[in-house]
């Protein structure tokens, strides 16, 4: 095994794109490792990970073999009776073999097999030096990096995410003599652009992280992240509050700075009259600042900026941040005040002139459909139908507001504030906001009953209209976000415990559509309903997979196509518990066998069991056990207590096993055969009453 040395590769660049930086760093790291692995160069990775700042991408590996392992080869040649003539001299066959091997035939070795003795050429090829392989490995890694818009600079033909300024190629204490992207490798790196003067000469790769830290650069993104969180939290505590640190904002800031330093800032209290969501969005999305909240989660007039420098005059830095945020807040306040003058109800007048979809009419048409759906759904879940209709009629009005035009992410949120200002009941104003939940993957569903009703009605109309208008998603195309709407609808129903009949709701949604897209003879309601139901189930498959539910369990329930998604969920829970029972596998296999037997039957199977035709003790015992189980589980099925149903059915295993071991189902006597089929049908129907448990059979 060859010696291993630490390896450092650093590409020093101009400021790299913030959003692309993590992906570039990971791709560079992965590409270098893949290139070494492809060439058989051993690597001790340890806890190595991608290293990066806005001005550099680096790979630091604790151990890389100095050379490839030697390559041993063996090439079989001709047998002796072909290789040598009668005088023991080489024939043309042997001479050709030796020439191809590049050696004299006398240097060839011999080996034997079942056919006799033959010549063989064995060779040992030394491995290439890793230092010689690394330039090509780096070129491959750079070429494979996901750079959406490569740049060219100077007179070079090279292209990269940003112009490359320096290159560190250090293997052990030796510089690899190579040129990449127009820059020659060296041991010289650079510190912070403003807080460190001069170059930094690295004696060895192991000096890299500490040398940069001394030069005010945290090259490890995790270290920058931890420092930012620590400093932001400390600044917020100093202000008497707590910082709002969203993951997205934090990741952006981590990739904007090399040496983060928190700066506490403030703005005029008058701006707090604006919905805090608008102010927070301005701070986070536009300026990458961290808002400070009070103990009740309300926005305060203070915020925290992250400087890429430790300033001697922090107050001046704070003034700069405050100067940047003030005009944006002033605009938001102007939009809000103007919207309040107009009023939420008046905003709705413009919806009739906004096209929702060519076949589905205007946004006003959609509002009318959603209002009717909400009014129909509300009584089924204990919500007020009058309030449901009112909330739905107002829910889209804020789309015409100045605030939402400037901050599209505030749709619904702005409507809540405007409804509250207009004196609408709190239930209605909250529902206007919650109608959009869940807004993204992993978001919470609506919490209030009215919000849940609106969320369901809105998504139901979107889905029904989309499918009726032929807008079903294909591949990556889903312009109306029907997949997201389907999952949002399903989650809201299931997680709210609403026992709604989904096919009936789909029918109501289809019936309210414009005549141009209503189901017709060629594509009737039943077809559209079935397509949409299956589409929603397909979204549920991923939902349950994310929760750790086995695909076999999902398929077992999906085969029954329960009308209620909440009922679907209860069956999923029950089948998960049933699968842990010792009887589960045997009963699943038995039900699979029953299905296969019944599938081959021609003609009608009797509905009842004739006890006078039960001849074998095992079939008598099974018939008695099945009737008892049916009696015991009827009430539990009615109550949807599927766990109890399956637990009771599990007790049938001894009788089921005995039946299949000792009874011939396809008896010669047609009456006996029909009676046994009737028994199996009764058994199979009850075993499959909660889920098609045969899916559990391996």
Swiss-Prot record:
Keywords: Aminoacyl-tRNA synthetase, ATP-binding, Cytoplasm, Ligase, Nucleotide-binding, Protein biosynthesis. Its EC number is 6.1.1.14. Its main location: cytoplasm. SMART domains: DALR_1. It catalyses: tRNA(Gly) + glycine + ATP = glycyl-tRNA(Gly) + AMP + diphosphate. It holds the Pfam family DALR_1. PROSITE patterns: AA_TRNA_LIGASE_II_GLYAB (PS50861). One of its GO terms (biological process) is arginyl-tRNA aminoacylation. It is found in: Cytoplasm. One of its GO terms (molecular function) is glycine-tRNA ligase activity. It is an enzyme of class 6 (ligase). PANTHER family: GLYCINE--TRNA LIGASE, CHLOROPLASTIC_MITOCHONDRIAL 2, GLYCYL-TRNA SYNTHETASE. Tetramer of two alpha and two beta subunits. NCBIfam families: glyS. This is Glycine--tRNA ligase beta subunit. It comes from Xanthomonas campestris pv. campestris (strain ATCC 33913 / DSM 3586 / NCPPB 528 / LMG 568 / P 25). The lineage of its organism: Bacteria, Pseudomonadati, Pseudomonadota, Gammaproteobacteria, Lysobacterales.
